[in-house]
Amino acid sequence: MCLILFSYENHPRYKLVIAANRDEFYARSTQPAHFWEKESHILAGKDREAGGTWMGISKKGKLSMLTNFRDPMNIKSNAPSRGHLVSDYLLDGDDAYSYLKNLEASGATYNGFNLICGSIDKLHYFGNYQNGVHEISTGVHGLSNALLNTPWPKVKKGKADLQAALEAETISPESLFNLLYDDVYAKESDLPDTGVGLEKERMLSPLFIKSSHYGSRSSTVILIDKSNRVQFLERTYNIADFTSSTVSFEFQV
C-alpha cells in the first residue's frame, strides 16, 4: 500500500474503517484479493513476483497493512521482500505486539517499511525508521510513505475526507472508493522532499496516482462493525482501458 486511511474506535457503528490505495508498477503481476488456497482463513491479494501481500485479514480476526518508507538513497538491492511481513503475521501464532517486537531485531535488513498489525480490537505500529512498537490510539489516522500521520498533503486531505465520511450513520463503501479516487496534485509549495526530485514528488502527491508506468493499481475498503462483521471490498483498476472490477467479501470474525 502507499496510502492507508483508517478510523479506529471512532464511530458508533464501526470498530474499524479502512480506505487504502495500493501503488505499484503496472507491469508487476498481482493476484486480486481472495481467500488463499492453502491458508483458507486468510483474505488478501498476492504479489505474484515475491509471493507476499500488502494488506490482509484473517477469519481469526488478525489484520495487517504495509507501506514502504520512501528513502531512495538507502535502497538495499539484496533486501528481503517486505510483503512477507504481512503474510507472516497473519500466519504466525503471536499477538501483534510480540510479532512486532521480534521484528525489531531484524528490521534493518529490510528496505524502509511501515507495518500495522493487530486484531479487530487493538492495533500496533512499527517501522524500521522509528524506534519501538507503538499501540495506535483511537481516532482517524493516515499512513503513506513516511511515518504514521506525517502531514503530507495526501495524508492530510485523506484524513479530512475520511472524517467527513464518518458523519454518516451507515458508511457506504462507494463513498470511500470515491475519496480514494482523488487524482488532484498537491501544490508545489506543500510537497515533501524525499529525494526523488520535484517532478516525481508532484506525480506521487495525489491520493490516486496515475502515470505512464506506475500508479494506484487497486483500492481497498474494509468495514468492521461492533458485532465483528467484516465487509472487505477491493477495486482493481485497468489503466489500459480505464475500466475497473470489484470483489466483495462478508464474514464474521
Residue ranges and their predicted role:
Residues 1-253:
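N-terminal nucleophile
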